[in-house]
Amino acid sequence: MRLRIAILIDDFYPSSGGIGRSVETQLEELTALGHEVTLIAPDRHLQKPRIGRVIECPTLYVEGLPAHLSILHWSKRRARLISEVASFDVVHTQTERGALGLGARIARLQGIPHLHTFHANIAGTHQTVHGATFGTLGYQALILPGLRIARGGGRAPSARLPAATSETGGLAARTDWKSFATIAQLADAYTVPSPFMRDLIDEAAGRRLPGYVVPTGYNRRMKRAIDEAPRERADGAIRFLSVGRLAKEKRLDVMIKAFRRAALPHAELVIVGDGDQRDRLKTLAMGCDSIDFRWHLSSTTALAYEFRNADALVLSSYRFDSQALVIAEAVSAGLPVMYCDDRLTVGVSPRTALLTGPDVASMAQGFRTLADGPLRASMAAASAELMPDLAPARTAERYVEAYTDLIERKATRG
């Protein structure tokens, strides 16, 4: 069955980090499966994809602010205008701002199911970003009431705080999961990239909701670039690689301290990325010639070169990432992975990755463990076992299964 799918996103496309990359994969892979995909995205900073259809939507946004503060217009009029030019079989929203309300209105107008994907673990921001509480309050004061209005009113679904043992990030973090559980019940179903997110949402809802775990697979262009990149190292050093934003929640300060404590001869740490922690991290690395900052690499070829010439990927975030897409990229490059967040289960296994504690001493020991060449070689070889489940086509197939299930259930309910 050929489906007509509307994908809605508040963030600028495609330059908005992991969410933009996930949406890009969805567009490409769903189209490759023969489905008709329409992207409804902000009309600012838009780089139109060469496939599918694009409907540009006005957005509330002040230039210069972060992209996650962009809000699509979600009025009844906007939903009606879109419905006059396009009919869909399913609406799939990707962000919890204007896109969520607009998607709900379109679904209601056209009598079709509404699927929502929770990409980000916003509950993980509270441990390092002090202003994150304002986001929690924003959900309670604006997003949830707005979504109820878009759905046509009615009683608010029941939700509760998950247990403090399930979410250890404090009251604000537990409140975020309660908000997610409310949103999940106001949509027809939801998806998440990792099992732990589904468990927390369903716990907050007090019951098992219609939900699906759909990890984002590796990017085909990145995989092709990695395969084509030359391996140009003959120095004999062990190169550990970190890729991502230089932000507090990524805890690169812990990584740098751990690497320095490990004091490995003939080892280097290459850090790719940029962000507001740049100066602090440079200061922490001062005097250590084996730590090299490559800053932001916008070229796929340049980033692929770093993966190809590394010996292991290191991830230091803890209780923040929802999936960590960089793990899928590391697997596609055949790299062992060292990480410290036990809730991350996508793209890792005991044969391919080393789980450490989140503290400096534990990560330092992890660096020492991965200094073992035969161990790294064994882990790299085992990474091939994970590739089929991380294939981007598998991501699209899982979404189609969810769409079909929702459409059939809605038809049965009449």
Describe these PLM feature segments.
Residues 375-390, 401:
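A short, well-ordered alpha-helix in the C-terminal region of glycosyltransferases
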Residues 89, 188, 308-322:
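Acidic donor-binding loop of glycosyltransferase active sites
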Residues 350-361, 368-374:
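Conserved acidic donor-binding segment of nucleotide-sugar-dependent glycosyltransferases
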Residues 327, 332-339:
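Short hydrophobic beta-strand element within catalytic cores of glycosyltransferases
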Residues 184, 296, 305-310, 399:
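Short alpha-helical donor nucleotide-sugar binding micro-motif in glycosyltransferases
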Residues 279-298, 312:
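Nucleotide-activated donor-binding/catalytic signature segment of Leloir-type glycosyltransferases, i.e.
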Residues 139, 143-226, 235:
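Donor nucleotide-sugar binding/catalytic pocket of nucleotide-sugar-dependent glycosyltransferases
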Residues 191, 230-259, 270:
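Conserved donor-binding/catalytic core segment of Leloir-type glycosyltransferases
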